[in-house]
Regions:
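Beta-propeller domain segments
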Residues: 1-16, 59, 71, 133-134, ...
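Conserved loop/turn at the beginning of each blade in beta-propeller domains
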Residues: 19, 29, 74-77, 97-110, ...
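Predominantly a core beta-strand signature of beta-propeller blades
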Residues: 22-23, 88-92, 154-159, 272-275, ...
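Structural WD40 beta-propeller signal
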Residues: 29, 39, 115-119, 174-176, ...
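Short coil/turn segments that connect the beta-strands within blades of beta-propeller domains
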Residues: 43-45, 122-123, 177-178, 297-298, ...
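Asp-box/WD-like beta-propeller blade repeats and closely related beta-sheet repeat scaffolds
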Residues: 96-117, 128-176, 184-188, 202-215
Length: 549
């Protein structure tokens, strides 16, 4: 729709790396890739790339408006899987395209992850998808699912269906000891259904344990007065109510083990045996098990995306965080504090107070005053950020580390020995920060570069008798001050690095979602303002390959 972006993947990569590493383009011209998996060994392997389809709520990202129709195999806004050989030549696909008979991925998307049960050795290929993307109607509620996909034909077999879906769907996958684990993001931004949730039509969050609500309600409209309790349908006020574990207010039913803002798991041999492994997160998007000989062994490393300035309980400046999930000895999930603790600090801390933004409920006109005239109403009614719960359901686990607000934790992987070259040490982690979507002001003040749109390195230092220390540093990013690469002519670098996985060859494969016009006024796009925000530009996705020299 007449939007353009600077994008030229034929240029030499502009990515800044430590000495001793090199970056190249493995695959380009992709449509919003989110996941990657490998099959084979170092001498011969295949690369499976998941294209997510319609992943963001914009008028331009609409699979139904594609000239060939929703079920056109070339529709860039529906999910699929592409298969490449180890040299980057496409050998199969698109696989799993939605069909009129209901086969393949769900057409609205997004699809988030793909993974083989046995890693590069194969086994069943699993994927996650939903109809979450539009955020505008009840049809996306409980639409998330986990399926298996035939890696040759793309034939789908649903494994677990009707999982919670709202602001965040079912996301990344991991496997261990006969169980499949997945990240199940919260259905709301901060525990309350607001106008940002399909005008209030989307489902409320589902707790993993019995909870008691606080006396607080959260206002979406002043006239008429509309307010909502946490973990409740839009406009329902129930101060002090007890919400039982796994109660889905949209269906009115309890489904054992199914909740959100959580890490869930199910037996591979019995998909109906679902358990909550860990909870109290907003969006625990990125998950990865450490090697068995790692200092973090026994836990699950989780990258969490923090709260936004939007909705009925807006916040500002909330950091993203790196957490370690461990199920309690009695089989109950451990708890990490959401929705009332942000990186272990109380939500009422002044640093998290909203400043007023165009996505806040009290700035939606009608029924409220438009932005920025609404700011006094936000400051009068949404400050401080009040508690959703009367008290935590159990002791709160603190994060291992925090990252910049809105930097967006989206991918984690542990380095293989072949990647260990200074400054990378054995047992280190690479993680991706996708970057913000413009709900708040940039998380850094110029000339300092904004945090995000990059890959970072964590080394774990453990000296006998001393606590484990995390050493975090930049690893791969665009030249200083550059965010998404498409904003600068003649720059060939990251736009939205969304995932990272190590291949059988020992190299890091970084999944770059591509160019996205964000919510900020500094959109960097050429095109009619009515087309934005959150416009996806098909064909700008890239798989980057980073290797030791």
């Amino acid at each position: 729709m007449d939007n353009t972006a600077n994008f030229n993947p034929t240029l030499p990569p502009s990515i800044v790396l430590p000495p001793g590493f090199t970056a190249s383009v493995f695959a380009q011209g992709l449509n919003q890739p989110t996941g990657i998996a490998f099959l084979g060994n170092s001498s011969s392997f295949q690369v499976f790339v998941l294209e997510s389809g319609h992943g963001l709520p914009s008028v331009c990202n609409d699979e139904t408006l594609w000239p060939g129709g929703v079920f056109d195999i070339n529709n860039p806004f529906t999910p699929d899987i592409l298969v490449f050989n180890q040299n980057g030549t496409r050998i199969r696909g698109p696989l799993g395209k939605p069909t009129s008979t209901g086969g393949g991925f769900q057409p609205s998307g997004p699809a988030i992850d793909i993974a083989f049960v046995n890693g590069t050795s194969g086994g069943p290929l699993f994927t996650t998808d939903s109809n979450q993307s539009t955020h505008t109607h009840n049809g996306n509620n409980n639409s998330s699912r986990i399926s298996t996909v035939n890696p040759m034909t793309g034939q789908f077999t649903p494994f677990i269906t009707n999982l919670p879906t709202g602001d965040h769907p079912t996301e990344q996958l991991a496997f261990k000891d006969g169980w499949i684990y997945w990240s199940q993001g919260s259905t709301t931004n901060s525990g309350v259904v607001g106008l940002d949730n399909g005008g209030g039509a989307n489902q409320s969050d589902i707790p993993c344990q019995d909870i008691t609500l606080s006396q607080n309600v959260f206002i979406s409209s002043l006239s008429p007065f509309v307010a909502t309790s946490g973990y409740s349908p839009f406009s329902k006020q129930q101060p002090g109510a007890t919400i039982p574990a796994f109660f889905n207010s949209f269906t009115g039913q309890v489904r054992q083990g199914v909740c959100d803002g959580a890490i869930l798991r199910a037996q591979l041999s019995n998909s109906s045996n679902i358990q909550a492994f860990s909870w109290g997160y907003r969006n625990p998007y990125a998950i990865r098990f450490p090697p068995d000989d790692h200092p973090l062994a026994g836990g699950l490393l989780v990258g969490v995306d923090g709260e936004d300035e939007r909705g009925a309980r807006p916040t500002n400046g909330v950091p993203d965080r790196l957490e370690l999930a461990r199920q309690n000895p009695d089989g109950s999930p451990d708890y990490h504090g959401w929705p009332d603790r942000f990186a272990f600090l109380p939500s009422s801390q002044a640093v998290f107070n909203p400043v007023g933004g165009p996505a806040d409920d009290l700035c939606q006109s009608p029924p409220n005053s438009p932005f920025p005239a609404c700011i006094p109403d936000v400051l009068a009614n949404d400050v401080p950020v009040a508690d959703v719960l009367a008290f935590p359901p159990q002791q709160i686990t603190a994060p291992l580390a925090i990252e910049g607000a809105d930097s967006s934790f989206t991918g984690i992987d542990f380095v293989p020995d072949a990647f260990v070259t200074d400054p990378v040490r054995p047992g280190a982690v690479l993680y991706t920060l996708e970057g913000d979507f413009g709900f708040s002001a940039p998380n850094a003040t110029p000339p300092a570069p904004e945090i995000g749109h990059e890959v970072k390195l964590v080394n774990f230092n453990q000296v006998s008798g001393s606590p484990l220390a995390l050493r975090i540093q930049n690893f791969a990013r665009n030249p200083s001050g550059m965010e998404q690469a498409f904003i600068v002519p003649n720059l060939n670098g990251f736009n939205r690095p969304l995932n990272v996985r190590f291949g059988p060859d020992g190299c890091a494969y970084v999944v770059d979602y591509g160019a996205v016009r964000d919510l900020g006024t500094d959109s960097h796009f050429v095109g009619p303002p009515a087309n934005g925000p959150l416009v996806q530009i098909p064909g700008t996705g890239v798989i980057w390959k980073i290797c030791p020299m």
